């Protein structure tokens, strides 16, 4: 049996990770969901996945679209509502949040790395040798979002204007127009 390792080698101190090995979910839908959630905060991702479970928001399928029907939504051509995958991803995100709290990180977490790899396909016993059991590994790395400190705004008197504007009166503009004609 081969040993599984994270694809990200060097983990920063403000990052936490979680892994779902041999999850019984489709590899193709896992890739699409990872692309949909990457770059979002964990709170946003959890709320989106809850809406997917309620079938209010579809996960857009952009790469594996063969036979996938059109879904209603902004910018979604094809999409699905993967229920098992949503459950696995919710558990994985909560696991990463727990790992982050153990490392004493605050609750503002952003999903930096979320990827799916194809797992081994076990032999399916029985009379149907063509039936495959779909499994995949899903890894997640979250990073703490540092709050930006607000600087006090500078007053207009402190800022020096580099350009000078010249305003013309109506009479100057009229004289100029008359000289052209």
What role is predicted for each listed range?
Residues 1-25, 98, 102-181:
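Low-complexity, rRNA-contacting terminal tracts
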Residues 2-108, 141-144:
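Ribosome large-subunit tunnel/peptidyl-transferase-proximal elements
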């Amino acid at each position: 049996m081969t040993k599984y390792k994270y694809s990200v080698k060097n983990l920063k101190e403000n990052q936490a990770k979680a892994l779902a090995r041999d999850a019984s979910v489709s590899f193709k839908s896992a890739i699409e969901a990872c692309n949909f959630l990457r770059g979002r905060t964990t709170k946003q991702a959890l709320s989106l996945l809850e809406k997917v479970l309620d079938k209010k928001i579809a996960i857009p399928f952009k790469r594996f679209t063969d036979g996938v029907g059109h879904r209603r939504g902004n910018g979604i051509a094809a999409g699905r509502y993967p229920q098992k995958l949503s459950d696995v991803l919710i558990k994985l995100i909560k696991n990463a949040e727990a790992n982050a709290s153990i490392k004493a990180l605050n609750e503002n977490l952003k999903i930096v790395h979320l990827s799916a790899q194809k797992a081994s396909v076990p032999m399916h016993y029985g009379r149907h040798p063509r039936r495959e059991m779909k499994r995949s590994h899903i890894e997640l790395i979250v990073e703490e979002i540092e709050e930006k400190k607000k600087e006090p705004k500078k007053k207009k008197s402190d800022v020096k204007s580099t350009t000078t504007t010249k305003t013309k009166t109506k009479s100057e503009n009229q004289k100029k127009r008359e000289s052209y004609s």
